[in-house]
Amino acid sequence: MKLVLFLVLLFSALINLTNADKMVVAHFIVGNTYPYTVSNWEEDIQDAIAVGIDGFALNMGSDAWQVERIEDAYDAAASVSSDFKLFISFDMSIISADADFIEGVVRRFADKPNQLYYDGKVFVSTFAGETDTFGYSDVSTGWDSAVKEPLASAGYPIYFVPSWTSLGQGALEESVADGFLSWNAWPTTDADMNDNDDIGYQNLANSLGKLYVAPVSPWFYTHLSYKNWAYKSDWLIIDRWNEMLSVQPDMIEVLTWNDYGESHYIGNIQGALPAGSEGYVDGFDHTAWRYLMSPYISAYKLGLSEPYINFESLFYWYRPTPKSATATADSLSYPSGGDYMEDEIFVLVYLLQSAEVTVTCGSTTQTFSGVPGVNQFTIPMETNASPSFTVARQGGTLASGTGPEIVDSLSIYNFNAYTGVLYF
């Protein structure tokens, strides 16, 4: 494993030297960092750098303590690497048209050495905010008059890239926006994700001379009193990265590093989990997905149409129960969209040479012939069974391992995913 991490770090360094303008950042929920110290931030930043992620979009609300945690994040980034960039993503579903607060935060962090600048301006993003007019006639006039112009007059011009997804392509056409971050990272029906929106956004951004930031996410499941649904996520992480290599957007934002409540985290589980999410997050490590992304990140930065495979490994993920499983003590209903998921075990194998991949779950065993490059395999789930995985070459076993048991019921509905990886 140390050799794999060394190769990933080495290749990431080469990419940073030759493709400094192509960035992959991860969306980071500051609201989940109440117990964080500088060392927690340093750990996350080092983990991100190891797979080629260039920075964090710091999603923040209005709590005073979040400003202090962001201060720690900038301090940590400065101690780890001057190349790792941070920028604020104002969560306007919480802040809601507080121009003084927004200006104060931008000014506080604008001169930090790890602040992301784009086109010579402080990079600023949002989650939502397309209905905030700050008392003016429309959203562009409001954001320009209440936020952009005062900051520019104070010597802090901003490059403004909001996530105003409800406006569709109209978000890019807003005069106040220098770019657009799409939040359309998941299919909302039983169909697989496609890149139609990305192509449209990127083409429009090109014609307007603006920036398009495309979203990539591995999964989506939330089971809380105020939101309770799943999106079809089976092969989503691979589908989405293949689409990114095809579209080659200006920038990519991974959704997310640590949104535990929506199950699309790729960082280590640490900090504070949203109340009610512990039952479907604890024990569901997603770090395998982080390492899975590395060859795709490298390929994106090189402008390649296929992932750059320079190490061998097997990744797997699956849910803890079939979609028909019952919940024995759940106060919430069955999550909408849960029936869109497939009852399968998903296996992705990176190979430099041909190998045999054997996957077993209960009474089912299948051996697949793997070829150099990326290999995708599935086998059906069986309950009361722990899936096992073996990779062999020329009669010798390269790696083997077993994942957690699949069961026929749980106390609460859980459409989160177990993930794992075998390095060899």
From Swiss-Prot:
Chief location? secreted
Signal sequence interval, chain numbering: 1-20
Give the record's PTM text: Not glycosylated.
Catalytic reaction(s) noted: Endohydrolysis of (1->3)-alpha-D-glucosidic linkages in isolichenin, pseudonigeran and nigeran
According to the record's subunit comment, the protein's assembly and interactions are: Monomer.
According to the UniProt entry, what is the EC number of this protein? 3.2.1.59
Gene3D superfamilies of this UniProt entry?
Glycosidases (3.20.20.80)
Single GO molecular function:
glucan endo-1,3-alpha-glucosidase activity
Any one cellular-component term (Gene Ontology): mating projection actin fusion focus
| Annotated function | Has a role in cell separation where it is required for the degradation of the cell wall material surrounding the septum (the septum edging) which must be hydrolyzed before full separation of the daughter cells can occur. Hydrolyzes 1,3-alpha-glucan predominantly into pentasaccharides.
Q: What is this protein called?
A: Glucan endo-1,3-alpha-glucosidase agn1
Q: Which domain of life is it from?
A: Eukaryota
What the entry lists under InterPro entries is as follows: Glyco_hydro_71 (IPR005197)
Q: One GO biological process from the UniProt record?
A: cell septum edging catabolic process
What protein family is recorded? Belongs to the glycosyl hydrolase 71 family.
Tell me the keywords, alphabetical order: Cell cycle, Cell division, Cell wall, Cell wall biogenesis/degradation, Glycosidase, Hydrolase, Secreted, Signal
Protein localization: Secreted; Secreted, Cell wall
